[in-house]
Regions:
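N-terminal Rossmann-like NAD(P) cofactor-binding subdomain of oxidoreductases
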Residues: 1-183, 218-220, 284-285, 289-295, ...
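Charged docking surfaces used in two-component/phosphorelay signaling
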Residues: 66, 155-328
Length: 328
């Protein structure tokens, strides 16, 4: 299987290389693709030194699958060019997510929707992926009516410049500013750009992508997204109102039996998910599971995951695995 990684020199691209090596995909040839300024750069993969190539060269090589993590503009321009030579694209940007002709995939939830006709497949936003991993099994049984979300998001979701800003500020140095304010010892309620409705783009991604993945746009969803000075992963406080009655013990059991989910929930031993322990792992961790005392048919969850792995690289590679095993 010939696979191209577009955006191989970026933060997510680096993690994707790690995940590809860990999960042992049947790769006969790996093409590392990046912008012109990175062409010729050498990157190690499984003991071999590979040279970065340009987009034109990669298209000419006609890979079976192209994993895109190079931003929306690159995806909009180049994904159709790869598709035209028979390549199946899995795109990690927001470029194709809400296109009604493209599927938005979390393999554990809706991977079975994929067919050989799907040449451009969208990977959801990081904060959406970890949340729907919890919501999907609950929605099937209890029918979700409304969701209230507050996210506490890692600076790695912004990129290398944000990590550099935090490190500089922690050391008292001046330097690049990825955010309009200091991030060290701060919380910024501003993820992505503000929209006309005064929500941020990140907040509305949670709304629209959740509707699409779960196949139900009747549920009410509102979100507040906050950037905090951590690097291990995203955390979410999620309040879920159901249409059907439930028992907390059944909620715990259902989540415990969900593939890709790890329940960490024992107040007596101070056991609950935290990004410092989620970092580097592919599971979605759920804890603080409790009935909403203000509403008889609602539950509160605390959901944590590594945004660069399950929130990006791992989910992308899992889609590729599904395609290789069932479609291509």
């Amino acid at each position: 299987m010939k696979i191209a990684l577009v955006g191989a020199t970026g933060m997510v691209g680096h993690v994707m290389l790690e995940v590809l090596a860990e999960r042992k995909l049947p790769i006969t040839e790996l093409l590392l693709v990046a912008s012109k300024r990175s062409i010729g750069k050498e990157i190690s993969f499984e003991g071999k030194i590979l040279k970065v190539i340009g987009l034109e060269t990669a298209v000419a090589a006609k890979p079976n699958i192209a994993l895109f993590s190079a931003g929306g503009d690159i995806s909009l321009e180049w994904a159709p060019k790869f598709a035209a030579v028979g390549t199946t694209i899995i795109d990690n940007s927001s470029a194709w997510r809400m296109d009604p002709s493209k599927k938005l995939i979390v393999p554990e939830i809706n991977g079975n929707e994929l067919t050989s006709e799907d040449k451009i497949i969208a990977n959801p936003n990081c904060s959406t992926i970890q949340m729907v991993m919890a919501l999907a099994p609950l929605h099937k049984v209890y029918k979700i009516k409304r969701i209230i979300i507050s996210t506490y998001q890692s600076i790695t979701g912004t990129g290398v410049k944000a990590v550099e800003q935090l490190n500089n500020e922690a050391q008292g140095k001046k330097g690049v500013m990825a955010y309009p304010y200091p991030i060290h010892k701060n919380a910024i309620p501003h993820c992505d750009v503000f929209l006309e409705n005064d929500y941020t783009k990140e907040e509305m991604k949670l709304v629209h992508e959740t509707h699409k993945i779960l196949g139900d746009d009747t549920m009410g969803i509102t979100a507040t997204a906050i950037r905090i000075p951590v690097v291990g992963g995203h955390s979410e406080a999620v309040n879920i109102e159901f249409g059907n009655p439930f028992e907390i013990s059944d909620i715990r059991k259902l989540l415990h039996n969900t593939p890709g989910v790890v329940v960490q929930d024992n107040p007596e031993t101070n056991t609950y998910p935290m990004p410092i322990y989620a970092e580097g792992k592919d599971d979605v961790f759920i804890g603080r599971i409790r009935r909403d005392t203000s509403h008889p048919n609602a539950v509160n969850l605390w959901i944590v995951a590594d945004n660069l792995r399950k929130g990006a690289a791992t989910n992308t590679v899992q889609i590729a695995e599904y395609l290789i095993a069932n479609v291509l």
